[in-house]
Amino acid sequence: MTQSTPIRIATRKSPLALWQAHFVKDALQAAHPGLEVELVTMVTKGDVILDTPLAKVGGKGLFVKELEVAMLEGRADLAVHSMKDVPVDFPEGLGLVTICEREDPRDAFVSNTYSNINELPQGAVVGTCSLRRQCQLKEYRPDIIIKELRGNVGTRLGKLDAGEYDAIILAAAGLKRLKLEDRIRSFIEPEQSLPAVGQGAVGIECRVDDERLLKLLEPLNHKDTADRVLCERAMNLTLEGGCQVPIGSYALLEGDEIWLRALVGEPDGSEIVRGEVRGHRKDGEALGIQLANELLDSGARDILTKLYADHD
């Protein structure tokens, strides 16, 4: 790659994916005036298979595989991901090199009739495709009915507006980025529902030997966000977490101290194992591993073993 070669960003075509790609393009050009950046749009399996729960068709990796192949084949230089959708491991030659500043990590309660979860009537129908959200919702409100909800943000809102659901749960960050914050009736605090690993953060994946690009991306990395998200991801990697299992995790920085909370649960909310750990931010990844092992020893191992057996 020469100094004048345009940077090519591989991106899905959904409005949120395009927002993220343009966000990185703008940030690169702000940091390096005159730099040429192009978007290379593509369709992934996750965009096409909309009639089956993610957990049953390969999980979140469905949204990134085509982008990774494009980078490995030299058709694109980097890919921009919502961190909550990034699998725990990467193909050889690629890596997560930059994590941008985190947006709101909370879940959002969206409804045309009700203001919050407490207002939902007995047996209300709530839409989500996330086992993590389902698990925590069902623990709090065992009476509600969870109904599968797939598609991009606009599609999901359309299904709510068509009367298929009493409420739906979406990531607050996505709604804010798409200027749809007015659809949020209330925010669900982490104390009530822990977010997904990396929720609200945008990450950049590229070839790890592309020295010119690594240098260009340096100003986009947000250290506080990266420390928090890498702590959460270390926990998730140790649990071998994926789409098939309800795992929530959220790290906060308080000065140089990092505070990590996490949970593993049954999809129906009948059992949830929770834990937390605090320590110095420089030990964030070790703390993530420590908490994962504590969760495993406290009952999470049995939950995970059962869930993975059910999917085999």
Swiss-Prot record:
Binds 1 dipyrromethane group covalently. SUPFAM superfamilies: Periplasmic binding protein-like II (SSF53850), Porphobilinogen deaminase (hydroxymethylbilane synthase), C-terminal domain (SSF54782). GO terms for molecular function: hydroxymethylbilane synthase activity. It catalyses: 4 porphobilinogen + H2O = hydroxymethylbilane + 4 NH4(+). The keyword Amino-acid biosynthesis does not apply. Its cofactor is dipyrromethane. InterPro entries: HemC, Porphobilin_deaminase_cofac_BS, Porphobilin_deaminase_N, Porphobilinogen_deaminase_C, Porphobilinogen_deaminase_C_sf. GO terms for cellular component: cytoplasm. The modification S-(dipyrrolylmethanemethyl)cysteine is found at residue 243. Its EC number is 2.5.1.61. Tetrapolymerization of the monopyrrole PBG into the hydroxymethylbilane pre-uroporphyrinogen in several discrete steps. This is Porphobilinogen deaminase. The gene is hemC.
